[in-house]
Each structure stands twice: as structure tokens, then as C-alpha cells.
Design a protein with these regions (language model features):
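Transmembrane helical cores of multi-pass secondary ion antiporters/exchangers
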Residues: 1-334
């Protein structure tokens, strides 16, 4: 079915508008905003109002663009003076915490899939770990949305530690996901190859993000553009240059853009306020588009056969893993 560009724009604008209205309702009840965007997509999807969208390739490409900007903006919002006192435990939680969550949750999924629950759900060990890796990290926007709506006050250095952990754990999850996908596609990869890929992506990602971030700061402060709005467009170009350059060097592009965002955000930058405002707006738009699109890809009737397994995994993940990480951050009150 061919749809004109005018109809496509009308439907897209209407979906985004409805998602924004739904997010207001979710905020009142302490429901994460991004979850409301996802539910909006499911409501308007195939099993809802009948909008059909099943192009996974398009979703992947849009998701890549969105994640680059979201992670870069998160890096810019991370203040080094706040996270310096909690840098060591925060990084430990963002790396080893995600790794252990992936490991134990993956083993649990593999164990549950062998229970013969008559669900037709079965995973290999690598497949189980891949599933766990995709849900091993937390989202900083969602975390603080819940904290604000529930009026939870964080004392001492817990807030910056939570910001650091939530903002920096995504690259680790992406890295694990990419490595596990490579293992599945290769049909078997040696431990040394996995270790080398892990180290290469981390080292090149961090080094590339830092160096290109410093270069971006130097160029922005010296280019001398007459139109102030062009600085925001320039930063947008730098985001994708950094991601693609590091990716082509076999590094982790998502980690690179996050590190570059931290470098740029903590440097003296011309038109910094205007750039931040522009990126905040872009981040919200892309979060809406990405989660709305993911919701459209979901067919709720296909979830029924796997619901029991999914509920068991969710309960295990919260009660034993995420809660233990929250305890490390917030203490016994968690």
C-alpha cells in the first residue's frame, strides 16, 4: 500500500502528539515517560488501531541515529566535579554491574527455557546471554522520572553516582550485545577473540571519543561562525563523525560519543547554552520517535505464548539483580 508523504507526515505528527499527551498521564502516576511512548506505539500498532510497521532495518537505522544523540547529550550533562568523588564506584557499577546482570540473568533465562513450560520458548546459552544483555542497563531519564514522581530524596553523593551509573552503563550493554551477536553469527568464537574484541572496542572507544571530543572543542571555539544557530548543527555533525570514525576503527562508537559528550560538556565552549538547548530538544524528539517506533513493531498477541517466561525473568531480574544494584547505590532504604 502506497501512502503519500502528506498522509505519512500527518499520521507521524498525530502519533507524536498523542505520545506527548500520554506521557503527562504517566508522569502523574510515576510511570516512566519512555514506557508511555512504547505503550502508545503498541496502542496504535497492528493489534491496536491497525497501523502496520514491520521494517526492522529502518528501525535499526533510526535507533542508531537516536542513540548517538541521546548518549552524547547524556555525556554533556555529566559534570566532572560532581562525579569525581564517586568515579570509581560509579564506573564499577556501570561496567561490572552490567556484566554480572547479563551473566546471571542470562543463566537464569537458559535455565528457565529448559523447564518444558509448554511455551515453545527455548534459548541457547549465547541467545540467553544476548537477551539478558539487551535489558541489563538502566535509563537515566526513566530513573529520575520515577524518583521525582515518588519524591525520593537522595543524600550525600548518591545522586551524582546514580547519574554516572545510569548515564554510563549503556555503552557496556551495547558492547556486550554486539559481542554476543558476533558470537551467534560466527557460530562460535574463541575466548581470546572475545577478549580482544572487548578490549579493542573499549580502548578505541574511550581514546577516540576523548581525542575527537577535544578536537571538536578546538574547532568550535575557533571557527568564528556569524550565525550562532550553526554551532548546534556543527556539533550534530561532530556526533556522527565521531561515531562513524570510531566504528570504522573497530571501536565502540556509542562509548565514543558518550565520552566525547563528557569532554565537550566539561570544556569552555562557545555558545554552549544554545547547543545544550538544541540537543535537549533533539533528544526528546528522538526518544519519542524511537520508543514509539519500537511499540509499533510489537504485536501484543505474539507475546502471549512467552508471557510466563517473561514474567519469571522480570521477577528474577528485579528481585535479585537490579535491586542489589539499587542497594549499592542507595543503601538499606532501597
Amino acid at each position: 500500500m502506497n501512502v503519500s508523504i502528506e498522509i505519512g507526515l500527518l499520521v507521524s505528527a498525530f502519533l507524536i502528539f498523542c505520545s506527548i499527551l500520554m506521557s503527562k498521564t504517566g508522569y502523574r502516576f510515576g510511570i516512566p515517560t519512555l514506557l508511555m511512548f512504547l505503550l502508545a506505539g503498541m496502542l496504535f500498532g497492528t493489534d491496536g488501531l491497525g497501523i502496520q510497521f514491520d521494517d526492522v532495518s529502518v528501525a535499526q537505522h533510526i535507533g542508531m541515529v537516536a542513540l548517538c544523540i541521546i548518549l552524547f547529550t547524556g555525556g554533556m550533562d555529566t559534570k566532572m566535579e560532581d562525579i569525581r568523588p564517586v568515579l570509581s564506584p560509579g564506573v564499577m557499577l556501570a561496567t561490572s554491574g552490567v556484566f554480572l546482570t547479563t551473566l546471571f540473568c542470562g543463566l537464569f533465562v537458559y535455565w528457565v527455557s529448559g523447564w518444558q513450560l509448554h511455551t515453545g520458548v527455548g534459548f541457547t546459552l549465547i541467545g540467553s546471554l544476548l537477551l539478558a544483555a539487551t535489558m541489563s542497563s538502566t535509563d537515566s531519564a526513566s530513573v529520575f522520572n520515577i524518583l521525582r514522581s515518588q519524591q525520593i530524596n537522595l543524600k550525600h553523593n548518591l545522586k551524582p553516582m546514580l547519574e554516572l551509573e545510569s548515564g554510563s552503563n549503556d555503552p557496556m550493554a551495547y558492547l556486550l550485545t554486539i559481542i554476543l551477536i558476533q558470537c551467534l553469527q560466527a557460530g562460535g568464537v574463541s575466548g581470546w577473540e572475545i577478549l580482544w574484541s572487548f578490549l579493542l572496542q573499549f580502548v578505541v572507544g574511550i581514546a577516540g571519543g576523548y581525542l575527537l571530543g577535544r578536537l571538536s572543542v578546538w574547532l568550535i571555539n575557533r571557527v568564528g561562525l556569524k550565525n550562532a544557530e550553526l554551532y548546534s548543527i556543527m556539533v550534530l555533525c561532530f556526533i556522527f563523525i565521531i561515531y562513524c570514525s570510531v566504528y570504522l576503527l573497530k571501536g565502540n562508537g556509542y562509548l565514543a560519543v558518550y565520552i566525547a559528550g563528557m569532554v565537550i560538556g566539561n570544556s569552555r565552549l562557545f555558545k554552549k547554552k544554545e547547543i545544550g538547548t538544541f540537543l535537549d530538544g533533539m533528544t526528546w524528539l528522538l526518544q519519542i520517535v524511537m520508543f514509539l517506533m519500537l511499540g509499533l513493531l510489537v504485536n501484543p498477541h505474539e507475546m502471549l505464548p512467552v508471557m510466563l517466561t517473561a514474567v519469571l525473568v522480570s521477577v528474577f531480574t528485579y528481585t535479585t539483580l537490579f535491586r542489589s544494584r539499587l542497594y549499592d547505590l542507595c543503601g538499606p532504604s532501597a
